[in-house]
Regions:
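Internal "kinase-insert"/substrate-recognition segments embedded within catalytic cores
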Residues: 83-113
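Helix-rich C-terminal or lid/interface subdomains of diverse kinases
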Residues: 72, 175, 182-242
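The N-lobe alphaC helix and its flanking beta3-alphaC-beta4 segment of protein kinase-like domains
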Residues: 31-46
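An alpha-helical support segment within catalytic cores of ATP-dependent transferases
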Residues: 102-149, 159
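Conserved short submotifs of the Hanks-type protein kinase catalytic core
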Residues: 60-74
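ATP-binding glycine-rich loop module of kinase domains
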Residues: 4-34
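Active-site acidic catalytic loop and adjacent metal/ATP-binding pocket
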Residues: 12-15, 134-178
Length: 242
């Protein structure tokens, strides 16, 4: 195993010869690696620009997945380094996101189910508020499109002409508007390009802005379960906007 390439909340990425291995934290179960490798392989089979998945390995009592190595910096890094090119990158991201949504995803888990489970489990909202959210979510469209789950510039690598999307554990089936709203939320919390990204996606797809923003209270409530430092206050404000 070679040098450490990246560190995430759930895993570390190391060089593995000419490839890389995503090595999960020691507490991660064997089925986590196999499940996520299967998800990635299913996305790869659709012809989307993702790294090839090669195998599941156990290394030093930790489970991991071996992928092709992707060269180049993330779009987030490139955007920070060239503010003038941000509109171009957002257009590329929007087109790529729409390309993902072009695929049906009947074999994937349900986006609304994932959101509902997270909303029901958060203790940061009282029971009446959770029930209001769950009732509203039930009336939102189901959809049958492939959704990335947390599509944002950190997980898109490489050249603007050949972007590669990495890290697919949250891939699911649902309404593209709900998926885009999740991206909008992440960008709103951590960058100042959320509105511009939303405009770019709406321009590419002709989906009304309001259709996407209708998902915002549900996306924000579900995000509370992830316990990301510094997000709680703003998420609660968005939830209470319902």
């Amino acid at each position: 195993m070679g040098r450490l390439v990246a560190i995430g909340q759930r895993a570390e990425v190391f060089e593995w010869g000419s490839r890389v291995v995503t090595l999960y934290r020691p507490a991660a179960a064997k089925n986590t690696a196999f499940r996520e490798a299967a998800i990635h392989a299913a996305v790869e089979a659709l012809g989307l620009p993702v790294p090839t998945v090669w195998s599941v390995q156990q290394i030093d009592r930790r489970w991991g997945i071996v992928f092709d190595r992707v060269s180049g910096r993330s779009f987030a890094e490139q955007m920070r380094g060239d503010a003038g090119a941000i509109p171009q990158y957002l257009q590329i991201l929007a087109r790529l996101h729409a390309r993902i949504h072009a695929h049906p995803a009947n074999e994937f888990s349900n986006l609304k189910g994932w959101l509902a489970t997270s909303i029901a489990r958060t203790m940061l909202l009282d029971k009446p508020r959770r029930q209001i959210l769950l009732n509203g979510l039930r009336d939102m469209p189901d959809g049958d499109r492939l959704c990335r789950g947390d599509f944002h510039p950190v997980n898109v690598l490489g050249k603007a002409s050949q972007p590669i999307v990495i890290d697919w554990p949250n891939a699911c089936r649902g309404d593209p508007a709900g998926d885009v709203c999740r991206s909008y939320l992440i960008l709103k919390l951590h960058a100042d390009v959320s509105g511009s990204y939303l405009d770019a996606y709406c321009q590419v797809t002709c989906v009304p802005r309001r259709t996407i923003l209708d998902w915002l209270p549900y996306a924000a409530a579900a995000r509370l379960m992830e316990d990301v430092p510094g997000e709680q206050h703003r998420l609660l404000e968005l939830v209470r906007s319902l």
